[in-house]
Amino acid sequence: CADDVIIHQYTGGTTGVSKGAMLTNKNLVANMVQIKTWMVTHLQESKEITLSPLPMYHIFAFTVNCLAMLSYGAHTVLVVNPRDIKSVIKEFKTHKISLMTGLNTLFNALLNHPDFSTVDFSSLKITVGGGMAIQKSVADRWKAITGCPLTEGFGMTESSPLLTVNPLDGSGKQG
């Protein structure tokens, strides 16, 4: 049933004690449909390769990289340790990544690594940041080096997670 709880997703506790959010089938399916509708003009079904440096136990990665992209037929490359910046860069060089999600901290670390500017970003169509505010300076540098806007989204665990996301063309307000 659409209103049945499908998962108890625990919050990060950034605003207090970690809580178990009860997410329903309807929550997750609605978020997947919203994500796919938002990305439809930039991605081709069953042709994309996504880079997922965020852990799947985090609602952002679980919904966007796992559920939405699998339902889109995308191949998802999991990064076991995103703090190992060389391994993230290696995945960019190994696969023609078309979509990446991450946090401002990760994008900044990648931009500051000397090998990052040697990557061919011609296949990168969408980069989405969440989990924290995206700094304008990081977004500007990301666009200058990769040619792809760094799009900021906002959400909460309780909302499965997306509430609002900037336009993919980079025209939205950062931070």
PLM ranges: what are they?
Residues 3, 25-26, 54, 95, ...:
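Structural detector for helix-capping/boundary residues
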Residues 29-49, 59-99, 113:
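Conserved AMP-binding/adenylation subdomain of ANL enzymes
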Residues 1-10, 17, 42-49, 159:
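Conserved pre-ATP/AMP-binding loop-to-beta segment of ANL
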Residues 6-33:
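Conserved AMP-binding A3 loop
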